[in-house]
UniProtKB/Swiss-Prot annotation:
This is Small ribosomal subunit protein uS3. The keyword GTP-binding does not apply. One of its GO terms (molecular function) is rRNA binding. It comes from Carsonella ruddii. Part of the 30S ribosomal subunit. Forms a tight complex with proteins S10 and S14.
Length: 203
């Protein structure tokens, strides 16, 4: 069971915080869900060059968006675009928008995937990429990186993965992060999956 289901979904009720914090009646649920998806899509489209750790969306009388970033320098890059972004969101949803930035220095699975994608686009060796990222995360209890597809232009698609520490997929009480994404190369699409076993008090 633990190997088939998404690890975040498996632990959602126990020790994982959901990043869409809003409640509504059944008749309005579809509208709020569309708003949530639309906001995340606009954020990804506008801040494509920024490595966002998490996006928290809180909808009530006002719309509150918390963006978690790892580097203060990233905030300086997007500072000039914030007014346009807030205006765009408030115009679509017709709500007052509060935008908060939270500087989160704890590395998570999405940050690792972001680094892996950048190194793949720079045409580094797949085995070298995985080895370097695992060494960076050796302070965690466990980390697993898997890259699949036509690696380095080979004719037959394959998987390359490596693990440091342990990844307890079946134990719900442990703080386990998971992230998957895709990147387009000249040989086709590569799939990237990250499992990260962190300390329970880390976000």
């Amino acid at each position: 069971m633990g190997k088939k289901i998404n690890p975040i979904l498996f632990r959602l009720k126990k020790n994982t915080v959901y990043h869409s914090l809003w409640y509504t009646f059944k008749k309005n649920f579809c509208y709020y869900l569309k708003c949530d998806i639309l906001i995340r899509e606009i954020i990804r489209r506008n801040f494509l060059f920024i490595n966002l750790s998490y996006i928290d969306i809180i909808i009530s009388n006002k719309l509150t968006i918390n963006l978690y970033i790892n580097n203060v320098d990233q905030f300086n890059i997007i500072e000039n675009y914030l007014d346009v972004f807030v205006f765009q969101i408030s115009k679509i949803l017709k709500k007052n928008v509060i935008l908060n930035f939270v500087f989160n220095h704890v590395l998570n699975a999405k940050n690792i995937a972001y680094n892996v994608v950048n190194q793949i686009l720079n045409k580094n060796s797949i085995k070298k990429i995985i080895k370097e990222e695992l060494l960076k995360n050796r302070k965690n209890f466990g980390c697993k990186i898997q890259i699949s597809g036509r690696l380095e232009g080979v004719d037959i698609a394959r998987k390359e993965w490596s693990l440091i520490g342990r990844i307890p997929l079946h134990t719900i009480k442990y703080n386990l992060e998971y992230y998957q994404c895709e990147t387009l190369t000249q040989y086709g699409i590569l799939g990237i999956k990250i499992w990260l076993f962190k300390k329970n008090n880390e976000k």
